[in-house]
Regions:
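N-terminal Rossmann-like NAD(P) cofactor-binding subdomain of oxidoreductases
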Residues: 1-206, 237, 309, 315-316, ...
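Charged docking surfaces used in two-component/phosphorelay signaling
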Residues: 187-361
Length: 361
């Protein structure tokens, strides 16, 4: 790419916004030129607006420190400076739906980390390795919005990234029933232990809205594009419980699964290790070389050892074994703010760029 695409971050001061900024430092295709946040941050430098709330392990990139934060509600002004935006705004769902459409209507593509548009019929919800073909929905969406280049694309919930890739890899064996429990990191709530001390040595057996997302969103990701809309996968039937656990980064899933035709363990592992999709074929900058790794040790995957596999963009599976009630059971692990949030959105933007949906204005 001769000239980098100009990127804006909506909701730049929050945890996911910060993750976008750290991931996009030195990105070969994209450059952060605009940061936008709430009116109370507008007019300050990014460094001032974030203050002591920088939550990343790496220092704040020099290139963004002195950027003046724009008011996210001043859509025309923000849009005029960028080729596309990443959205990580903290608003009500109705407000998010409205503001993301406003940006799209200024002919600015929106790649969103938010859940507001995940069930909008003509908005693709994509894990690029699994369902990059769903980006073709954008043509239908542009007709509705009356745009030529503006659109919205979203990534699914962080909780599903630890097991949905395995379901996709095993598609030919017909996953039929899935029982999953997720053990979710506190960064998924935008928190650290410093600002959520009651999570130390604690487990909370409830995360609002998360179980429904974890049961339904995989069916859209695994669905097929027919006549300008997504036909949801009818199987597997998924039931889920979601727990908040005292871990900073990394969502773990304990999964039981039945198949239409029961494969061997060796077949399942082979499918995991060989699974790849558009990001690997197109050699996108953020794509993991190997999307899913299988770990044969009894005590893996572990958050401390494995959460940063492939820079947090890969998924780790382990403990695959036969079960007395189900065909198999296994453990999955993914990085919830990299693959599950900002990193997954960056990979979507790379895929959209490679496919020609995102271009310089």
């Amino acid at each position: 790419m001769e000239k980098k695409l100009r990127v804006g971050i909506l909701g730049a001061t929050g945890m996911v916004g910060q993750r976008f900024i750290s991931l996009l430092e030195n990105h070969p295709w994209f450059e952060v030129v605009t940061v936008a946040a709430s009116p109370r941050s507008a007019g300050k430098t990014y460094e001032e607006a974030v203050g002591g709330r920088w939550k990343m392990d790496t220092p704040m990139p020099e290139g963004v420190k002195k950027l003046i934060v724009k008011n996210v509600n001043e859509v025309e002004e923000v849009s005029s400076t960028v080729d596309f935006v990443f959205s990580a705004v903290d608003m009500t769902k109705d407000e998010i739906r409205a503001i993301e459409e406003e940006y799209a209507k200024t002919e600015t593509p929106v790649v969103s980390n938010n859940s507001a548009h995940r069930w909008t019929k003509d908005v693709p919800m994509v894990v690029p390795e699994i369902n990059a073909a769903h980006f073709d929905l954008i043509k239908t969406q542009k007709e509705r919005l009356g745009t030529t280049r503006g659109f919205i694309a979203v990534k699914p919930n962080c909780s599903i990234q630890s097991y949905t890739p395995a379901l996709a890899a095993w598609k030919e064996f017909g996953p039929k029933e899935v029982v999953v429990t997720t053990y979710q990191a506190i960064s998924g709530a935008g928190k650290t232990f410093k600002d959520w001390p009651e999570m130390i040595e604690n487990i909370i057996p409830y995360i609002g809205g998360e179980e429904e997302k974890s049961e339904k969103e995989p069916l859209r990701v695994l669905g097929t594009l027919e006549n300008g809309e997504i036909k949801l996968a009818e199987e597997p039937k998924i039931t889920c419980q979601c727990l908040r656990v005292p871990v900073l980064n990394g969502h773990t899933a304990a999964v039981f699964i039945n198949f239409e035709k029961k494969p061997t363990k060796e077949q399942l592992i082979e499918k995991l290790e060989s699974f790849k999709g558009f990001p690997q074929e197109a050699e996108l900058p953020s794509a993991p070389k190997q999307f899913i790794q299988y770990l044969s040790e009894d005590d893996r995957p572990q958050v401390k050892a494995d959460v940063n596999y492939e820079n947090g963009m890969g998924v780790s599976i382990g403990r695959l074994r036969e079960d007395s009630m189900y065909d198999y059971k296994f453990i999955g692990l993914s990085h919830n703010t990299v693959r599950g949030a900002a990193g997954g959105a960056v990979l979507c933007a790379e895929a959209l760029t490679a496919k020609g949906y995102i271009q310089a204005k």
